[in-house]
Regions:
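Glycine-rich phosphate-binding loop of ATP-dependent small-molecule kinases
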Residues: 1-194
């Protein structure tokens, strides 16, 4: 489907526990893309002591969300650091319509665009089971409580699910069954991307 595109830019999203981080890494390796995880970008800016990292830390130390403008500025710098390349896979961003519009504008200003948006679809009962199992070894407290897991899934539905219609209108949205062995899901993704 997208093999003829010289630079492939993908957004991958899905509910917590859907396997998006694992699949993003596998797809990155398969297509030689740059994996951009907003969490990693934040940690890098903070540990490097950049101005953006310092600003983000000020918000985070007060328990406040970092404004989208700061996040977009970090992403812009990250993208500039790697262009030219084969493309990017964005993992964990965008999460809201406003972020999606900001990302589109940022990429448009750099003569780039999102080519495809892939959502890994998994039923909530399967996700809860996966996350509780992961919580046994991850050490993440939000993976160890069914109440916290349900809150995260509800948060996703409220904030991130509206992105489906946003990207459907752009004819970029594809839904992939995220249930099964990792390699089965990867095969479905590669079939869609090829």
């Amino acid at each position: 489907m997208l093999k003829s595109i010289s630079m492939l830019n993908i957004v991958i999203f899905g509910k917590p526990g859907s396997g998006k981080g694992t699949q993003a890494t596998l797809i990155k390796d398969n297509y030689d893309l740059i994996h951009i995880s907003t969490g990693d970008v934040f940690r890098k800016n903070i540990s490097d002591g950049t101005e953006l990292g310092k600003t983000a830390t000020q918000f985070m130390s007060k328990g406040e969300l970092v404004p989208d403008t700061i996040t977009i500025s970090m992403l812009e710098q990250e993208i500039k650091d790697f262009v030219p390349c084969n493309g990017f896979i964005f993992d964990g961003f965008p999460r809201t319509i406003l972020q999606a519009k900001s990302l589109d504008e940022l990429l448009d200003n750099m003569n780039l665009k999102i080519d495809i948006v892939v959502a890994l679809e998994v039923e909530n009962n399967v996700l809860t089971k996966r996350l509780l199992e992961r919580g046994k070894t991850s050490g993440r407290s939000d993976d160890q409580s069914e109440v916290k897991i349900n809150k995260r899934l509800d948060e996703y539905d409220k904030k991130t699910k509206p992105l489906v219609n946003f990207y459907k209108k752009q004819e970029k949205f594809v839904s992939i069954d995220g249930v099964g062995e990792f390699d089965q899901v990867t095969d479905r993704l590669i079939t869609t991307l090829d």
